[in-house]
């Protein structure tokens, strides 16, 4: 019987990793079960990035297992959470076990809205889903019900419990990035390595991409260089898909969209920019590196809505800035060809060379340009879809799961 297991909220803001709980759960499962009993890749699902309460990575994990009884999967998940989670502070681990995973509307709602715990419990009771724990069941349920049929990406996460974390050489990362792009992405930004987290967790690096073979090659070269025991797991993810933009809610703590003429632009604390578009205040953080929004005359922006003083404020994640410039020129003299000048009287122009006075209209020249506003690679949120991925949607589905998906 195929049974889906979801886990969330097992880490704190400074320790632990929910993906490591899944890694150890699968390694334990494989001690007594064949690999064929694990249905495709485990899944790493990022949730609504705008909710005020979320785990450090704001992600839940899930996997499909072929077991004789769903209680077997539940017991395995409970063991892994007890052994590898950090239940301190605001951590509220949750486990979900379901024999179906096709209630995709739950996934889309978890990406775009705020789901109360009592609503999730009501849905699970109605669907016959087994659950244990606290607030983490919301993300766990969303991960189980994730819809990755149209687009998904992969991430290989390598683990080590040794401290300190090994140093990853920037030159090697750049070389591997150049040889695997565009089938891997978000590896490096200038001289800054993006693949290594700096928190107190067992993840030593994560390689994202659309081809399992390219990310395995990338990881193998790094493992050889940093000289640690190879331990990794490849996840199927919704990262870099832009799934959170599929539903625009325009209410607090949801993804929002604003379009209109720019009425005011001003610098606020920290060098950030506040733009008034119609009646909405749009905020752009300086470190995002948006290029031209301070010059925009018309702006299309998307991001997260948060309550403002009198209305909703949009915190910009990306968009399009349009710059319109109106250039007014005096025409040339129809008699001698010199540039006409103003006479100081409305509507009249005078030629400084031949003295002709004329009522010829001034020439209006319109110029326009637009820029696609994307954050710097080092500031990209997990769900943000980079332009480099356009045209690669669904490519993951072309490849079979390689034998080295877990080691």
Curated annotation (Swiss-Prot):
GO terms for biological process: tRNA wobble cytosine modification. Disulfide bonds: none annotated. It comes from the Archaea. Transmembrane segments: none annotated. Its EC number is 6.3.4.22. ATP-dependent agmatine transferase that catalyzes the formation of 2-agmatinylcytidine (agm2C) at the wobble position (C34) of tRNA(Ile2), converting the codon specificity from AUG to AUA. Pfam families: TiaS_FLD, TiaS_TCKD. It catalyses: cytidine(34) in tRNA(Ile2) + agmatine + ATP + H2O = 2-agmatinylcytidine(34) in tRNA(Ile2) + AMP + 2 phosphate + 2 H(+). It is found in: Cytoplasm. It is an enzyme of class 6 (ligase). Keywords: ATP-binding, Cytoplasm, Ligase, Nucleotide-binding, tRNA processing. The keyword Oxidoreductase does not apply. GO terms for cellular component: cytoplasm. This is tRNA(Ile2) 2-agmatinylcytidine synthetase TiaS. Belongs to the TiaS family. HAMAP family: tRNA_Ile2_agm2C_synt. One of its GO terms (molecular function) is ligase activity, forming carbon-nitrogen bonds.
